[in-house]
């Protein structure tokens, strides 16, 4: 285990919807990579308990997706609160990356950050203010070299840990085919 300000923190959340004022975080996962995108460690993967009233706020897409993935059942069985998730995630990150050093990394990560800001501000403050958003590169590729998108596909399980693995693999793909650095 090597703490480094060059390590990158990848995070993914699953939520009951898209509005942090109405919806809740239902799953969180983190991965730390080095600057070359080699996975150093996987953090806690936590389904966060929510009431039936909160789960009822999910639209059909969320209900179907999170039920089919098994996440809804994990949420119902979970004893973890948001505070537990914050505490465990920060304890993991402190072993790998100094506070404020890593940008928040992921796909459409601005949405996750909005939820962290509202529901887990202590964790949100652990990240540098910058973003490493893989979806930005995807959008540029879609416009400038759309043929390259055919060479990569994600699992799309909508489980937090799987989604992070997809994001890291996608950025590796872009590095190899676009950046050639």
UniProtKB/Swiss-Prot annotation:
This protein's UniProt keywords: Cytoplasm, Exonuclease, Hydrolase, Nuclease
EC number(s) recorded for this UniProt protein: 3.1.15.-
Membrane-crossing segments per the record: none
GO molecular function: 3'-5'-RNA exonuclease activity; nucleic acid binding
Annotated SMART domains: EXOIII
Subcellular location: Cytoplasm
Statement: the UniProt record of this protein carries the keyword Nuclease: yes
Record-level GO BP terms: DNA metabolic process
Pfam families named in the record: RNase_T
InterPro entries found in the cross-reference section: Exonuclease_RNaseT/DNA_pol3, Oligoribonuclease, RNaseH-like_sf, RNaseH_sf
Catalytic residues in the record: 129
One GO term describing the cellular component: cytoplasm
Top-level taxon of the source organism: Bacteria
EC category: hydrolase
Domain Exonuclease: 8-171
Family: Belongs to the oligoribonuclease family.
Function in brief: 3'-to-5' exoribonuclease specific for small oligoribonucleotides.
NCBIfam families listed in its UniProt record: PRK05359.1
Protein name, UniProt field: Oligoribonuclease
